[in-house]
Every structure is written in C-alpha cells, then in structure tokens.
Amino acid sequence: MPTVSVNKQQLFDLLGKNYTSQEFDELCFEFGMEMDEDTTEEALKTGEEPELKLDISANRYDLLCIEGISQSLNEYLERKERPDYKLSKPTTKLIIDKSTEQIRPFATAAVLRNIKLNEKSYASFIALQDKLHANLCRNRSLVAMGTHDLDSIEGPFHYRALPPKDIKFVPLNQTQEFTGDKLIEFYKSPEQKNNIGRYVHIIEDSPVFPVIMDSKDRVCSLPPLINSEHSKISVNTRNILIDITATDKTKAEIVLNILTTMFSRYCDEPFTVEPVEIVSEHNGQSRLAPNFNDRIMDVSIKYINSCLGLDQSADEIAHCLKKMSLHAVQSKEDKDILHVDIPVTRPDILHACDIMEDAAVGYGFNNLPKGEKLSNANFIAKPLPINKVSDIFRVASSQATWVEVLPLTLCSHDENFKFLRQSDNGDLAVKLANPKTLEYQVVRTTLLPGILKTVKENRKHSLPIKVFETGDVVFKDDKLERKAYNERHWAAIYVGKNSGFEIIQGLLGKIMQTFRTEWIADYGAAASGRGYWIEEDDSVKTYFPGRGAKVMFRSKEGAEPKQIGHLGVLHPEVMMNFDVPFAASFVEVNAEVFL
C-alpha cells in the first residue's frame, strides 16, 4: 500500500474541521484508508508543520495527493458534490510518428490552462507524479510523464523515436548540452545511480530513444528519463503541458486523467482541461485527449443486498454510492438494475463487486447487520474453476504417495533452456528487464527447473524421491495486449537408481482416471470418445533419445485430439546440469484442458 504524507492543517482546512487524532483515524478507517502516523509531537520539537501519513489502497490512484483525499472525504461526509470535469477547445496537437512503435508506442497529452499554483500545491503536483511513477507506472517502465511550461515551447508537438546521437538538448537541472548516448553515460555514473540512473535500463539497449519535440525541433523531454531544462516548470508557470508516453495505453490514459482531474481545480476555470489532439494515423489511434466521458456499469440490487445482508431500496443504495463518487439511477426497464455512473477518477471500478464494496463503505461497515440478521448473506468463498482443478491434481497425486513442492516461479535463463538441452528463440519466455541476480532472469515456461532444484537440495534423502507441483508457467504472446499469458500446469518426477518410467506413467494414468479420462489403445484409434494416449516424440531434447513421448488428449466424442503434455526419461546431461546423480522420469501436463 502506498503511503502519502499530507500537511495536517491544510487537510483539515480543506475538510472544514479540526479533528483529533482519534477522530481522524476513525474517519480514515470507515472510508477505507489507514492513518499510519501523526507527526504532531515530532513537529513540535523540530519546528516543522505536522503531517499525517496515510496508507492508501494500491488501486486508488485518486487518493495519492491531498487534493484527491480531501475531495473524496468531503464527498463521503456529504459536504461536497462530485466535480463535473469538462474539456475546452483544443489549441494544439501531438503527432505520433510510426518510429515510436520500436520502443514506447503510446503517447497522450493535455494542457492545464491558466493554472495558479502556490508552494504547497506545486509540491503536491510534483509528489503526485512521483507516486504514480512508483506505483501504477512501475518505476516508469510502463508509463512516464513529463510537465512543461507551455509558454516556452510551441506546438504542434512531435513524438518520435530517433538514434541517440541525433538527440541533443540540455536536460533538467543541468547547464551542459548532451546527446542521447552521452546522457546515458552521465546518468549511469555513481552520483546518479540512485536518481535518474534507476531508469536508464529501460531504454539504454534500444537503437532509438523516444523524444518529444516542439514545432521548432526543440527537445521537450526524453521519456522515461528526463525533461528539458528549456521547458522547466515552476510555481509561477501559468500554462502546463502534460505529456504521457507508455507501453500500456490503458495505464497512460489513467495517469493523464488522474493528473488533470486532481489539479484542474487550480485553473481559472476550475475542473476544466484543455485537450490535445492526438494524431496517430499509422495505427488508427488518433483521438482527443483526455477523455472525460463517464463509464456506465449495471449492477443488480439483489446482488448488493445479498452480499451485504441488507434490504436496501434503489434510492438507499444510490445514496450510499454517491458518498463514494458513484452516481446511480434505477433502470426503467428492470427495477432490479442500477445504472451506475463511474467517473474518470475511479479506474479501480472494474466489476460489480467493486460497486458492492463501495456501497458497503457508504453504508458503513460498522452499521452492517451482525449475527442472526446475516442469514441472507453467504460468506463462503467459491474457488476459481482452475483452482478447483488444481486441488484435484493435488489430492490425486498425494493419494499416490507423491509429495508436493512449491519452487519459485523465477529461474535463470540457463536453467529454463540450456540446462534442459533446449534453445531459446526469443519468443517463448518472459525475461526480466533488470534482474537483481542471475538466478532470477526469466519467468519459467516449464515446471521442471524448480522441481529439479528441489530434488538437488534433497538428494541426500532416501530414494526414490517422488515429488509433484501444480503451478503457473508463463508464455509470451505478442497478440495479447499484456504480451504474455499464464498457464496452469501439473508436473511430477520420480528419481531413483532406476528411471522408473513405468511408475511415472502409472501416476499419469491415475490422474487421468481421476478426471474420468480413459486410456485409448492404438494411438487413439481403438475408440472415438474421450480419452488419452501417448505417442513417441524425440522433439523434446530434455528426454533420453527414444524415451520421450507426448501426451495426447481427446476431450469428447469426435473432437480433434491435441497434445496436452509430455513425459519421458530425463537425459543424463540434464540430471548432471542440476547436480542430481540419479536417473529420473518426468511428466508435465497442461491442467487447463480439464476446465
């Protein structure tokens, strides 16, 4: 949970009341925050202004600054209405070049026109950017933001990807001009290691660097590292251009919405933002940014009441939701449905359960019925289907006297490929961009490395060693927005003086029998219904030649059979790579086919 420090008296002034420490602690608890510390006593000794340190939910990005905290608490206390965020007419453009697809493909922008900041609001503006960078932006790897004095630069603005040597500018708080490659060297120096140097790894290996320039080709920023000294903002800046670059479009839009909604209150026309026309013709992403259109989500009144043990009317639930910045009206077609209007400041609302939770907060957790009055509320959790399948694998394996192990999901690149006699073509495993140690370089694509490392650490135990694991592996997929996906696997190994292939095949048979999947002889030709069989397969070099097989599965009558796993006798070279001086057989199956 992020911790936000706010000026105590400033917050109480915004709330219109001076709370005691206990009163404010109770208010935070009721709202869903936690007061971590009140520095009043320390401040009296040092002569500084007292601060409150608040623990915020990780998905409530609108609460990462004093502006958002005070606005949300005032709405919760019914002292203020939800702001109506508006857009004025655009006056400039951000043109995105196709070359940016090589490194950070998404960009967006907005203008805070005629803004008036003081020392405290300016500090809050900078602090919010730091909090967003550290949390939602994943230390600038997903999203980076820059702010510029619009009066010092001229639009339209261009977002390009250029070779490092072609980029020249004076970076923020410096007096010397650098090229892109020289700037990387500068920020990798020991003096900058804990500052901007923390983000150098994001772009340093790329042949091109992202850069935002104005109409006169003056560099505004080199995301995700540094802004230009030329466009530096100050407390006296009246017009601020906000630029966002990202590898994730959704998160980029969230960051822009949070920054603009939180600080547009200081504009001459409060809560009004000047949009920027985003021109991105190469990928069809041209649009006006930001987008302040509210989302509408439908939720069942019965669902909310059943979860909370209440019998609230539509108006009563709407009143609770209003305290949490959500406006709701009852559907005219279906009286059980509420149309909930979700503002751009609440990207954390993703499902009806989020609305139900806010209704509970608005109603008051301490006011919820207790004891016998909860007869219509069900608190027994329902397992996800894949977890239910995983538990079946665990029970069946344990009944067969195998012991479950829980290795780490990360492993070294060699353990995932070279040690298993496999090659890496670059499109299979997710690699960590900046691994702390050589032992944690990639996310595993098979359960075998972790199991073999477990066997290695327990090789002094009596033989045979029979262990299994049910866990996730991860594969890259460029077709998906997140570029990767999880897949639940089950795997088991038999380690002894003999390979024990017949034993591992027997375990596979028990697992399949547990899932009502019968063995089909003659490579699946003996029957046309649901079942499984194995076929010899020498393509997996992890196994001894002629001792590897693929597991084939037909889910139902007439269905096309498909490979769901593999088994075999592990190659002696694989065993020696993991310092295990015994023979072994291994089986691994995709558990998701049984959903």
From Swiss-Prot:
<dbReference type="InterPro" id="IPR005147">
    <property type="entry name" value="tRNA_synthase_B5-dom"/>
</dbReference>
<dbReference type="InterPro" id="IPR045864">
    <property type="entry name" value="aa-tRNA-synth_II/BPL/LPL"/>
</dbReference>
<feature type="binding site">
    <location>
        <position position="354"/>
    </location>
    <ligand>
        <name>Mg(2+)</name>
    </ligand>
</feature>
<dbReference type="InterPro" id="IPR005146">
    <property type="entry name" value="B3/B4_tRNA-bd"/>
</dbReference>
<protein>
    <recommendedName>
        <fullName>Phenylalanine--tRNA ligase beta subunit</fullName>
        <ecNumber>6.1.1.20</ecNumber>
    </recommendedName>
</protein>
<keyword id="KW-0030">Aminoacyl-tRNA synthetase</keyword>
<dbReference type="Pfam" id="PF17759">
    <property type="entry name" value="tRNA_synthFbeta"/>
</dbReference>
<keyword id="KW-0436">Ligase</keyword>
<dbReference type="GO" id="GO:0004826">
    <property type="term" value="F:phenylalanine-tRNA ligase activity"/>
</dbReference>
<keyword id="KW-0648">Protein biosynthesis</keyword>
<keyword id="KW-0547">Nucleotide-binding</keyword>
<dbReference type="GO" id="GO:0005524">
    <property type="term" value="F:ATP binding"/>
</dbReference>
<dbReference type="GO" id="GO:1990825">
    <property type="term" value="F:sequence-specific mRNA binding"/>
</dbReference>
<comment type="similarity">
    <text>Belongs to the phenylalanyl-tRNA synthetase beta subunit family. Type 2 subfamily.</text>
</comment>
<dbReference type="Pfam" id="PF18262">
    <property type="entry name" value="PhetRS_B1"/>
</dbReference>
<dbReference type="InterPro" id="IPR004531">
    <property type="entry name" value="Phe-tRNA-synth_IIc_bsu_arc_euk"/>
</dbReference>
<keyword id="KW-0460">Magnesium</keyword>
<keyword id="KW-0479">Metal-binding</keyword>
<keyword id="KW-0963">Cytoplasm</keyword>
<feature type="binding site">
    <location>
        <position position="358"/>
    </location>
    <ligand>
        <name>Mg(2+)</name>
    </ligand>
</feature>
<feature type="region of interest" description="3'-CCA residue in tRNA">
    <location>
        <begin position="86"/>
        <end position="90"/>
    </location>
</feature>
<feature type="binding site">
    <location>
        <position position="348"/>
    </location>
    <ligand>
        <name>Mg(2+)</name>
    </ligand>
</feature>
<feature type="domain" description="B5">
    <location>
        <begin position="292"/>
        <end position="370"/>
    </location>
</feature>
<dbReference type="GO" id="GO:0005737">
    <property type="term" value="C:cytoplasm"/>
</dbReference>
<dbReference type="InterPro" id="IPR040659">
    <property type="entry name" value="PhetRS_B1"/>
</dbReference>
<dbReference type="GO" id="GO:0000287">
    <property type="term" value="F:magnesium ion binding"/>
</dbReference>
<keyword id="KW-0067">ATP-binding</keyword>
<dbReference type="InterPro" id="IPR045060">
    <property type="entry name" value="Phe-tRNA-ligase_IIc_bsu"/>
</dbReference>
<dbReference type="GO" id="GO:0006432">
    <property type="term" value="P:phenylalanyl-tRNA aminoacylation"/>
</dbReference>
<dbReference type="InterPro" id="IPR009061">
    <property type="entry name" value="DNA-bd_dom_put_sf"/>
</dbReference>
<dbReference type="Pfam" id="PF03483">
    <property type="entry name" value="B3_4"/>
</dbReference>
<dbReference type="GO" id="GO:0009328">
    <property type="term" value="C:phenylalanine-tRNA ligase complex"/>
</dbReference>
<dbReference type="Pfam" id="PF03484">
    <property type="entry name" value="B5"/>
</dbReference>
<dbReference type="InterPro" id="IPR020825">
    <property type="entry name" value="Phe-tRNA_synthase-like_B3/B4"/>
</dbReference>
<dbReference type="InterPro" id="IPR041616">
    <property type="entry name" value="PheRS_beta_core"/>
</dbReference>
<comment type="subunit">
    <text>Tetramer of two alpha and two beta subunits.</text>
</comment>
<feature type="binding site">
    <location>
        <position position="357"/>
    </location>
    <ligand>
        <name>Mg(2+)</name>
    </ligand>
</feature>
